[in-house]
Amino acid sequence: MKKIIACIGTFFALVALSTQAKNPYLLQTADRSAMEHWVDSVFESLSPKERIAQLLVITVRNSDTPQNRKTLQRLIQEQKIGGLLFDSGTAKDQANLTNYCQSLSKVPLMITLDGEWGLAMRLSDTPRFPVNMMLGAVQNDSLLYEYGRAVGKQCRCMGIHVNFAPVLDINSNPRNPVIGKRSFGESLKNVSSKAIAYAKGLESVGVMAVAKHFPGHGDTSEDSHKTLPLVPHSKGRLMSTEIPPFKAYIDSGLSGIMVGHLNIPAWDATN
């Protein structure tokens, strides 16, 4: 089974870049002192190898079979991984496997989801929400906040801590084969406001939001799951068009950002 190590391509850009990041939205109602005490105590109990392994989130099969359970047991008890991203499947299998995996782990596993419009993006037997392009036409952003809360509650029911959403890419290239309906639209302002409202809804119920695909995957013509798309624009264009939604997201105190698999010569011309 092919395994993808998500900690390299998927980078959590902690929002220490903004003043509000000193008090992230997700933690505004949390007991910071108690959390930090727990984290410090767990960290001190881990070996250097275990600390490194905590950075790894592995994509695994969502199939409740003896063979898959054996694979998961090895990853957790031998490799000491920090988290899981389940592939597509059913809610029943994922719930069973989540409970099984958590029972094996010395440190509670971080369970993640790539669910831009909720569980149904990955789990076949769950309630389905509209895709982002449809929601981009909604005039009232408070509805996007409530939508985010609904998705967050779905995640909580499944023991999911992190959702790799929202998409902050501006859908500016009609030849883009991979963003399209996943974007909230072609308006910079609309994408920013809709995505931030959705992310705040997620985080209001305790699910970490991870915006993507920094610094912007909207104006590409190739699929980053299959190759390395080129973003040919100048730094000036990037800072005026692609970057602003991510800056607004950071300034709102939201928690995580995923870096896209992109070739951006304006920032790094090396091959």
Describe the predicted segments one by one.
Residues 1-27:
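Bacterial Sec-dependent N-terminal signal peptides
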Residues 31-64, 70:
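Mature N-terminal segment immediately following signal peptide/propeptide cleavage
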Residues 54, 80-82, 106-109, 160-161, ...:
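Short, well-ordered coil/turn segments that N-cap beta-strands
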Residues 201-210, 224, 237-256:
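Phosphate/pyrophosphate-binding betaalpha-module
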